[in-house]
Amino acid sequence: MSDLKAAALRALKLMDLTTLNDDDTDAKVIALCHDAKTPVGNTAAICIYPRFIPIAKKTLREQGTPEVRIATVTNFPYGNDDIEIAVAETKAAVAYGADEVDVVFPYRALMAGDEKVGFELVKQCKEACGDILLKVIIETGELKEEALIKKASQICIEAGADFIKTSTGKVPVNATPEYARMMLEVIRDMGVAEKVGFKPAGGVRTAEDAAAYLAMADDILGSEWADNMHYRFGASSLLTNLLNTLEVTDQVADPAAY
């Protein structure tokens, strides 16, 4: 197997196969669940709006892949600084049966100089999650500056985040290799690689993209680190490209860009 094929297979099993569109329907989510089951292995998770969790759970169970995790989003996509609402949404997501919650950090508050609200929001959302995985989206493409990206990452980790995630996919600039490196360096420098993971989202569209991101993680945190409890790709169109790279042609995912 070529290096690119090996990276494609590895990336496929680290995907949070995502649909977070205003026109999502039960039918689209059912199709997403079907796409998560591929001839070469399953994606790690699907990522959907909370209201679709029950139909997704049923579909994954019926197709024989109950191990595919269900991630959902809260405080999404704007990352407002109302802690009460973010926590209420997170509790509701848990009640719906989410396995993982991707919450948006109040990044604009941090840009305005308020570090406390972000810490408190993440801390309380993690308390609401208990053992459920909490991924925190810091919206790197809006923070832009290295100092802010690293500060947001540190705050999230100190507040109990299980993962730090680049982006919602809803702003002009999403994941970039430069932003990914900054966030991975924080995980390394804080000595939390065992318990904190990383998720680039938006803009990872090809096997070559995924291979480059994984090579960076291997370089910074070691070749054993990026397993499915420490690394995810938030993407949708990526799956089709990975399957094409692996020469799997009997299944094509929805190419809607994320």
Swiss-Prot record:
Keyword Calcium assigned: no
Main location: cytoplasm
UniProt-listed Enzyme Commission number(s): 4.1.2.4
Pfam families: DeoC
Annotated compartments: Cytoplasm
Keyword Methyltransferase belongs to the record: no
Pathway connected to this protein: Carbohydrate degradation; 2-deoxy-D-ribose 1-phosphate degradation; D-glyceraldehyde 3-phosphate and acetaldehyde from 2-deoxy-alpha-D-ribose 1-phosphate: step 2/2
Active site residues of this protein: D102, K165, K199
GO cellular component, one term: cytoplasm
GO BP term, pick one: 2-deoxyribose 1-phosphate catabolic process
Catalytic activity: 2-deoxy-D-ribose 5-phosphate = D-glyceraldehyde 3-phosphate + acetaldehyde
Assigned keywords, A-Z: Cytoplasm, Lyase, Schiff base
Family under the similarity heading: Belongs to the DeoC/FbaB aldolase family. DeoC type 2 subfamily.
PANTHER family in UniProt: DEOXYRIBOSE-PHOSPHATE ALDOLASE (PTHR10889:SF3)
Protein task: Catalyzes a reversible aldol reaction between acetaldehyde and D-glyceraldehyde 3-phosphate to generate 2-deoxy-D-ribose 5-phosphate.
Protein name from the UniProt record: Deoxyribose-phosphate aldolase
Source organism of this protein record: Vibrio vulnificus (strain CMCP6)
Gene for this chain: deoC
